[in-house]
Amino acid sequence: MRLVGSQYKDMEDRLSPSARLVRSPGSQTRIHSIESILGFKGETLFHPAFPYGSGKTGKDTEHLSPKKDSNKHFDGVCRSTVMVSPDLPDADGGKLSDDENPKKKHRRNRTTFTTFQLHELERAFEKSHYPDVYSREELALKVNLPEVRVQVWFQNRRAKWRRQEKLEVSSIKLQESSMLSIPRSGPLSLGSGLPLEPWLTGPISTSSSPLQSLPSFITPQQAVPASYTPPQFLSSSTLNHSLPHIGAVCPPYQCSGFMDKFSLQEADPRNTSIASLRMKAKEHIQSIGKTW
């Protein structure tokens, strides 16, 4: 149903929570609102301490006061529980010293060895890298150090020795690898890959001058001495077509002053064996010639 005009407006004023007291000069009008129906008084409704529409009466404020007291009590309990332990140091007191704190690890000062002590320790290390207890105690008395310090020194010295050994081995390996990696250049090489000198790779011929293929530091005059006579089996008719006469090719050998004093046969200790071999070869050739 729809209300029209003043009736609709009057109903809105009655049901509105923001209805106000309408005062006339002579009398006070009756308030028709939810607050008046529920029994709220105008003094409590429009009291300046409470905002309009809060809906809190004096009884509600009385119920709120114990909550504030309980909150204060709760804060006191929390503060009492969160207390600094008497065993812990005060924040303003600073940190404990090393003597007062037994849990802190005691750091030992670094031992400084003298030259005499280092010399004796190195001598003992050269004798044995792992000395026994008696040797360490004797050495400790000698160098005026505790036995524990001597033991620790030997441990550190062995570690240093191992590092040096590893470095030496690695340096040797590096040198070997660098030497293998260097390419060797040569004019000519065989199938095996080994380089050859130029005089070794010269042509080999059976011409009338076979001494031309000799190395450059050996002259033809120094190649064959004049007093040298080849075996008779080399001058046989079977080898005349392949080997020329050496005496005709080579000029007389010019011996030095030392060779003038001592002949070649006297200087050669194998002259007797060579002579015997020549005789055997001669007899063998003669025996072969008789059969033919």
Swiss-Prot record:
PROSITE patterns according to UniProt: HOMEOBOX_1 (PS00027), HOMEOBOX_2 (PS50071), OAR (PS50803)
Gene Ontology biological process: adenohypophysis development; camera-type eye morphogenesis; cell fate specification; embryonic camera-type eye morphogenesis; eye development; eye field cell fate commitment involved in camera-type eye formation; forebrain development; hypothalamus development
Purpose: Plays a critical role in eye formation by regulating the initial specification of retinal cells and/or their subsequent proliferation.
Octapeptide motif, short sequence motif: residues: 32-39
SMART domains xrefs: HOX
Family annotation (Pfam families): Homeodomain, OAR
Entry's localization field: Nucleus
Family recorded in the similarity comment: Belongs to the paired homeobox family. Bicoid subfamily.
Biased composition range(s): Basic and acidic residues: 57-72, 92-102
Annotated protein name in UniProt: Retinal homeobox protein Rx3
Entry keyword set: Developmental protein, DNA-binding, Homeobox, Nucleus, Transcription, Transcription regulation
Motif stretch (Nuclear localization signal): 278-282
Residue ranges of the motif OAR: 272-285
Region span, Disordered: 1-27, 53-72, 85-107
DNA-binding region residue numbers: 106-165
GO terms, molecular function: DNA-binding transcription factor activity, RNA polymerase II-specific; RNA polymerase II cis-regulatory region sequence-specific DNA binding
GO cellular component: nucleus
